[in-house]
Curated annotation (Swiss-Prot):
Its EC number is 7.1.1.-. It catalyses: a quinone + NADH + 5 H(+)(in) = a quinol + NAD(+) + 4 H(+)(out). It comes from Dehalococcoides mccartyi (strain ATCC BAA-2266 / KCTC 15142 / 195). It is found in: Cell membrane. Belongs to the complex I 49 kDa subunit family. Keywords: Cell membrane, Membrane, NAD, Quinone, Translocase, Transport, Ubiquinone. GO terms for molecular function: NAD binding; NADH:ubiquinone reductase (non-electrogenic) activity; quinone binding. This is NADH-quinone oxidoreductase subunit D. It is a peripheral membrane protein. GO terms for cellular component: plasma membrane. PANTHER family: NADH DEHYDROGENASE [UBIQUINONE] IRON-SULFUR PROTEIN 2, MITOCHONDRIAL, NADH-UBIQUINONE OXIDOREDUCTASE 49 KDA SUBUNIT. The gene is nuoD. NDH-1 shuttles electrons from NADH, via FMN and iron-sulfur (Fe-S) centers, to quinones in the respiratory chain. The immediate electron acceptor for the enzyme in this species is believed to be ubiquinone. Couples the redox reaction to proton translocation (for every two electrons transferred, four hydrogen ions are translocated across the cytoplasmic membrane), and thus conserves the redox energy in a proton gradient. NDH-1 is composed of 14 different subunits. Subunits NuoB, C, D, E, F, and G constitute the peripheral sector of the complex. It is an enzyme of class 7 (translocase).
Length: 367
């Protein structure tokens, strides 16, 4: 006699420690195997894009801090770069170098947080997270030196920065760059060959190259699937074309490769930082920008390579001091759209390992 079975619907979230935000997953299971997945988001929607259209261009900078709040510096950069392009504002040489320095520090800090939480989700409770937050804290202290904030920095301005780097910033940064590669080696010794990590991640949650491209995956998620695409190299912005660095990629597209790409990216960020500190010129940190900015009527799209992937801003100006349209292209939302392709066919026990490997921040997804 055949046994009659039925699919089981499992809801995870919207309050769940491994979703790292208010997010719900609706799973359909056959036993323990995931046969379908529906991501349900919007719980953190704040209407940022519409709010931004009712404020001046300058007043909108703090909104960008609150998208991916673990990547605020790069968010600031993407937005001010779009406005500068729209208004024809030139950025001084020193300010461009400082932007590269802050962007790469933010990339390292974001990867440290993402990897720490990912390993926490795997079951390595607290220890790897605290190891990585030990170094992230040093970067947060650098951001605090220049902006006065440990989160939501609001440091970038159209044409440069609100103020120059303090005297103690560069010595502290050089000290960090001397020690950070050794700590990355330590992470690899503890994690990259750990048998439990290998069992939980190798070959798990594979996102094939074609699916990664078709789903518009971005950043480490895309590069782990064998796609060599990085805005810093493929469409250079700021002064990234002056630096020597490699674009880490992998071929398997699994959970382990997404982890390894981020580890290697931190090493390349250190490489860029050393060049930027060595070549940092003296001079002005603020270009000529009007106090009340009214860009000429027109539209612009500007993009950068943030820690999570390609972050873009589309702006439409009607000639007033407020944007007519203010649109964000968030990499976290695009990476989340590929989650179903990664998890179908895997057991529910593997879900959080796969989900943690794409490093989602819901503030950017819901906006």
């Amino acid at each position: 006699m055949a046994i009659k079975t039925e699919s089981f619907i499992l809801n995870i979230g919207p309050q769940h420690p491994s979703t790292h935000g208010v997010f719900r997953l609706r799973l359909i299971l056959d036993g323990e195997v995931i046969t379908d997945l529906e991501p349900v988001f919007g719980y953190l929607h704040r209407g940022i894009e519409k709010l931004a259209e009712g404020r001046t261009y300058l007043q909108d900078i703090p909104f960008t801090d609150r998208l991916d709040y673990l990547g605020s510096m790069t968010n600031n950069h993407a937005y001010v770069m779009a406005v500068e392009k729209l208004a024809g504002i030139t950025v001084p040489e020193r300010a461009e170098y400082i932007r590269v320095i802050l962007d790469e520090l933010q990339r390292i800090a974001s990867h440290l947080a993402g990897l720490g939480f990912f390993l926490n989700d795997l079951g390595a409770l607290q220890t790897p997270l605290l190891y990585m937050f030990r170094e992230r804290e040093k970067i947060v202290e650098l951001f605090d030196m220049c902006s006065g904030q440990r989160l939501n920095y609001n440091y970038y301005r159209f044409g440069g920065f609100v103020q120059d780097l303090p005297e103690e910033f560069l010595p502290a940064l050089k000290k960090l760059l001397d020690t950070l590669p050794g700590f990355i080696d330590e992470y690899e010794q503890l994690i990259s060959t750990n048998e439990i990590v290998l069992i939980r991640t190798k070959g798990v949650g594979v996102l094939k190259r074609e699916l990664a491209i078709n789903s518009s995956a971005a950043g480490p998620v895309l590069r782990a699937s064998g796609v060599n695409w990085d805005i810093r190299r493929n469409d250079p912005y700021s002064i990234y074309d002056r630096f020597e660095f490699d674009i880490p990629t992998a071929q398997n597209g699994d959970t382990y490769d997404r982890y390894m790409v981020r580890i290697r990216e931190m090493r390349q960020s250190v490489r860029i930082l050393r060049q930027a500190v060595k070549d940092l010129p003296e001079g002005e940190i603020m270009g000529k920008a009007p106090k009340l900015l009214k860009p000429p009527a027109g539209e612009v799209y500007s993009r950068i390579e943030g820690p999570k992937g390609e972050l873009g801003f589309y702006l439409v100006s009607d000639g007033t001091d407020k944007p007519y349209r203010w649109r964000v292209r968030p990499p976290c939302l695009l990476n989340l759209s590929a989650l179903k392709d990664m998890v179908v066919g895997w057991k529910v026990a593997d879900l959080m390992a796969i989900f943690g490997s794409i490093d989602i921040v819901m503030g950017e997804v819901d906006r």
